[in-house]
Regions:
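Hydrophobic alpha-helical transmembrane segments of multi-pass small-molecule transporters/permeases
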Residues: 51-59, 158-159
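Blade-loop segments of beta-propeller domains
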Residues: 31-43, 50-53
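Short, flexible active-site-proximal loops enriched in glycine and acidic residues
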Residues: 48, 63, 81-82
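Flexible extramembrane linkers and terminal tails adjacent to transmembrane helices
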Residues: 9-29, 33, 67-149, 153-156, ...
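Membrane-interface alpha-helices at helix entry/exit sites of multi-pass transporters
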Residues: 48-50, 153
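Specific transmembrane alpha-helical segments of multi-pass solute transporters/efflux pumps
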Residues: 55, 59-67, 166
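Hydrophobic transmembrane alpha-helices of multi-pass solute transporters/permeases
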Residues: 1-6
Length: 302
């Protein structure tokens, strides 16, 4: 459902470094509505889903890593920090969330890289030739030009941005729930909040995380576009930020953010759904254990 929004976001976000846009054959997109109208006209309606299959292949493992590793990191940080104050308690979700973000980003980065390169390819094989036709084609061409290093362009900034995003995403959500309930314990799974309240804090967490980290994501995405052009075309992060702000101002770091904010609804729904599932599972385990304990006591009395 959100694939067209994701592709429009990527195109707007990276067009300052695109070799296909800003030429006599195809001008740059002025904004969200301009891109939504012109992309189907220039590349066909189904081009709005270009790169979506690869994004799906990346998305499920990423969410699995995020939620399965969150509790592991949370328990590890709790053991190392041994929190005694409210501040140290609330710090745990931020650290655990950031750590799972870096983990998933690093493991799945080649998929993220290829998804970006394929999605921002605005070629239609008529006026502009397409650069990549799939995952294998993208990897082969980038590796031939730059080696494996080319597949990891922008990893440093992307990992830093993901740490901030996930730490804010999980941290704000947890902190908001605990503040609402005025509980003394920071354990996310030991408290229950109304569904609408959980959705509100999840959406708030997604929006805040996006506003904070979007410039870092923009720089990382544009860094990805330098791969495949030869090592001589590589640009430092400092020079890239200077080029973007010099040409478009600070606003250039936030191009495409409106489309990104529209997709945050899905992120908040996933977080709340995961919370509900884990709560029900813990209740089920607790009831089952209590039932087994009662049966054991009855058999012992006999």
């Amino acid at each position: 459902m959100t694939a067209p929004l994701e592709r429009i976001k990527l195109i707007l976000q990276t067009q300052a470094s695109s070799s296909q846009l800003g030429t006599s054959k195809r001008s740059s997109y002025s904004g969200f509505l301009d891109a939504m109208i012109r992309v189907p006209q220039e590349q066909g309606f189904w081009s709005l889903w270009r790169g979506n299959f690869l994004n799906i292949c990346r998305y499920f493992p990423a969410q699995a890593i995020n939620f399965s590793c969150y509790d592991l990191y949370y328990d590890a940080y709790r053991y190392m920090i041994r929190p005694e104050t409210a501040y140290s308690h609330h710090l745990l979700p931020f650290l655990a969330g950031g750590s799972v973000g870096v983990t998933s980003c690093t493991i799945l980065y080649p998929f993220t890289f290829c998804n970006t390169r394929i999605s921002v390819d605005v070629g239609d094989n008529k006026s502009i030739k397409r650069e990549y036709y799939g995952l294998n084609d993208c990897i082969r061409k980038v590796y031939k030009s730059d080696g494996y290093r080319g597949l990891y362009q922008g990893l440093a900034f992307s990992a830093c941005g993901m740490f901030l995003y996930r730490s804010t995403y999980f941290g704000v959500y947890t902190f908001g729930k605990l503040t609402y309930l005025s509980q003394g314990t920071p354990e996310i799974h030991s408290v229950q909040t109304p569904l609408l309240v959980s959705l509100f804090f999840a959406q708030l967490a997604s929006v805040i995380a996006t506003l904070i980290t979007y410039p870092m994501e923009t720089i990382a995405r544009q860094k990805m576009l330098l791969s495949g052009r030869g090592l001589q075309s590589y640009e430092s992060y400092r020079h890239m930020v200077g080029r973007i702000t010099r040409n478009d101002g600070v606003f250039g770091l936030y191009r495409g953010m409106f489309a990104k904010l529209l997709t945050t609804v899905c992120g908040s729904l996933i977080l709340v759904t995961y919370d509900l599932i884990t709560d029900h599972y813990k209740k089920y385990k607790s009831k089952r254990f209590r039932r087994k304990l009662e049966d054991f006591k009855k058999s012992d009395e006999r």
